[in-house]
């Protein structure tokens, strides 16, 4: 809800949080802070962490009905701004160049973890080479799951068809729920769709080949 309130505030140009901000904070909130990527911007990333600091520590409103009421009020008063925000997030989640592999050293943020291990360094190099490709886009795997469901539907009475429809259907629904409730765009949130698309696609293909092989 904090993320949604930030998005609606940005698209309406009006504060939707149940608190007041300084002139500087308002300018940041409405013009600078919002990115359709993750709610961490308002939680722990400077210079916009003042949002959660005020909601949670100063006003003690986080996880209270005040936030829920402010969210419901904002959505009802500004449905188009809410949809703009959710659409922007969804597009970024499905097609954006999002975080795929954590390589930063928490204790030494400027350094890469396991930099002294050749195998890991090789893995990071492969990751960097493949990251711009569709393989690391959540939308690719969502589309694959939907396509597999389309091929599996006519064979849903068979074991292979039911399996593919079950795993890929659940993965597609899971990914699509992020359009309404997602608050972060990391590629890891699409892992189920990746596994389901690969396994479901393989099972569907084998099921279609079975009559030709028998």
Protein language model features and the residues they cover:
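Membrane-interface junctions at the ends of membrane-embedded or membrane-associated helices
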Residues: 153-160, 201-214
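Membrane-interface anchor segments at the N-terminal boundary of transmembrane helices
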Residues: 82-167
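Membrane-proximal stem/loop segments at transmembrane-domain junctions that anchor or position
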Residues: 1-113
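Catalytic cores of PAPS-dependent sulfotransferases
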Residues: 147-151, 173, 197
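Aromatic-anchored segments of alpha-helical transmembrane domains
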Residues: 169-180
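Membrane-embedded alpha-helical segments of multi-pass membrane proteins
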Residues: 139-144, 190-200
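Membrane-embedded glycan transfer/ligation machinery
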Residues: 45, 49, 170, 190
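Membrane-interface catalytic loops of GT-C/OST-like multi-pass glycosylation enzymes that act
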Residues: 179-193
């Amino acid at each position: 809800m904090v993320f949604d309130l930030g998005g609606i505030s940005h698209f309406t140009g009006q504060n939707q949080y149940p608190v007041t901000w300084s002139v500087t904070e308002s300018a940041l909130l409405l013009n600078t802070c919002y990115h359709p990527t993750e709610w961490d911007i308002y939680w722990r990333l400077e210079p916009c962490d003042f949002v959660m600091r005020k909601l949670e520590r100063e006003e003690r409103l986080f996880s209270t009905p005040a936030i829920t009421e402010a969210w419901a009020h904002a959505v009802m008063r500004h449905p188009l701004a809410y949809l703009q925000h959710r659409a922007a997030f969804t597009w970024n989640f499905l097609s954006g160049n999002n975080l795929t592999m954590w390589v930063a050293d928490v204790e030494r943020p400027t350094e890469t973890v396991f930099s002294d291990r050749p195998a890991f360094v090789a893995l990071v190099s492969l990751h960097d080479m493949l990251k711009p490709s569709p393989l690391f886009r959540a939308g690719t795997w969502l589309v694959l799951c939907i396509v597999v469901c389309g091929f599996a539907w006519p064979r849903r009475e068979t074991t292979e068809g039911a399996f593919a429809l079950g795993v890929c259907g659940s993965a597609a629904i899971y990914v699509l729920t992020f359009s309404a409730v997602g608050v972060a765009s990391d590629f890891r949130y699409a892992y189920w769709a990746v596994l389901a698309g690969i396994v479901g696609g393989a099972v569907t293909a084998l099921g279609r080949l079975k009559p030709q092989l028998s």
